[in-house]
Amino acid sequence: MNTEKPSVAHNVDHNEIAKFEAVASRWWDLKGEFKPLHRINPLRLGYITERSGGLFGKKVLDVGCGGGILAESMAREGATVTGLDMGFEPLQVAKLHALESGIEVEYVQETVEEHAAKHAQQYDVVTCMEMLEHVPDPQSVVHACAQLVKPGGEVFFSTLNRNGKSWLMAVVGAEYILRMVPKGTHDVKKFIKPAELLSWVDETVLKEQHITGLHYNPITNTFKLGPGVDVNYMLHTRAKKA
């Protein structure tokens, strides 16, 4: 990784944002480009809810919320949810869908670093799903998430491992063969090995609690969580108590 870090206000890849801006209007189309996100969301939500001891009454931040799929589902569980994203169009879609659904979610367009400077230790749960591989400095995002969570609070990350298998499955398979996501969605060079993510976590008040893989079976066309972090994986961390 480039040792020259982007400034806090510019930890943004505008090409990445443009990708999602272009398809934002179809974020809630269950048969569109975001179909995989809709399909894995129950698994993500179940993992977050179980590992955090329930979301009801908790203050939750969803970093890189996009069109609000996870944010809305956490709000339905009784959480007070704030969604952060740097994409204007996805946030507009998220706001409109929440209004149509009668779900209250606060959506904010700013970086997680900017948010951390104003809202340190204010959240019971912070989620950062499929976002780290889309920013220039994922380490900075991890640090900001750690600053935002309350002592004893939970932080969840999900991303893609960087190896030949993940390139084959997430890029060649998902983008070109099965066409589950648009071509160019992923750049294998930006994928993150679990050891790298854990090393960034260790630089903060966060401590690893659990890690699991997210697996897709093309034969049965099903997703499941389980051992093995070769491709997609989720990490649960907890902030040290004061």
UniProtKB/Swiss-Prot annotation:
InterPro entries given in the database record: SAM-dependent_MTases_sf (IPR029063), UbiG_MeTrfase (IPR010233)
Source superkingdom: Bacteria
Gene Ontology terms describing biological process: methylation
One GO MF term: 2-polyprenyl-6-hydroxyphenol methylase activity
Cleavable signal peptide: none
One family name in Pfam for this protein: Methyltransf_23
EC number: 2.1.1.222, 2.1.1.64
Pathway in which this enzyme or protein is active: Cofactor biosynthesis; ubiquinone biosynthesis
Keywords: Methyltransferase, S-adenosyl-L-methionine, Transferase, Ubiquinone biosynthesis
Residues noted as binding S-adenosyl-L-methionine in the record, renumbered to the chain: R44, G64, D85, M129
Catalysis: reaction(s): a 3-demethylubiquinol + S-adenosyl-L-methionine = a ubiquinol + S-adenosyl-L-homocysteine + H(+); a 3-(all-trans-polyprenyl)benzene-1,2-diol + S-adenosyl-L-methionine = a 2-methoxy-6-(all-trans-polyprenyl)phenol + S-adenosyl-L-homocysteine + H(+)
Family statement: Belongs to the methyltransferase superfamily. UbiG/COQ3 family.
Role description: O-methyltransferase that catalyzes the 2 O-methylation steps in the ubiquinone biosynthetic pathway.
Protein name in UniProt: Ubiquinone biosynthesis O-methyltransferase
Organism: Salmonella typhi
